[in-house]
């Protein structure tokens, strides 16, 4: 059985195939959390709790509220840390199903069933100098597969460290174009 992939695992593989093999396949080296990854995980958790459970954002992260609240102002069902998985035939499947081919987690997903539009966002605490829009395309395609009634997906990398709108990498995909790609 081939392991399922994700955008982040693909980026790791593209960065250094040997390192990927040593770390992910052979599991020779355990993951070493850095200050940056620890901070990013703490911010993600605080935002997830704020969205899912209405837990107040800790004081050290309140500067991120304008970006988070801008997303929450969109109409529709709000889903935090929404797990999506597809088979090799691009059909939705369970996260841990034996037939899973690709996985992705939407940090925030807003599905508007009335206007058939969705917003998918990924919180970023790092540098916004080289945004990776390929992640947005993958997430948009996964949303289309999981929500077949949706006609348009707006996707964004949300750089919470930079609260001006120009620091949002944005991508929109309509159902017709998505069907051509799948």
Name the predicted role of every residue range:
Residues 5, 38, 42, 131-134, ...:
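Generic recognition of stable, solvent-exposed alpha-helical segments in well-folded globular domains
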Residues 2-56, 81-82:
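Nuclease catalytic cores
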Residues 33, 126-129, 172-175:
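Active-site oxyanion-binding pockets that recognize sulfate/phosphate
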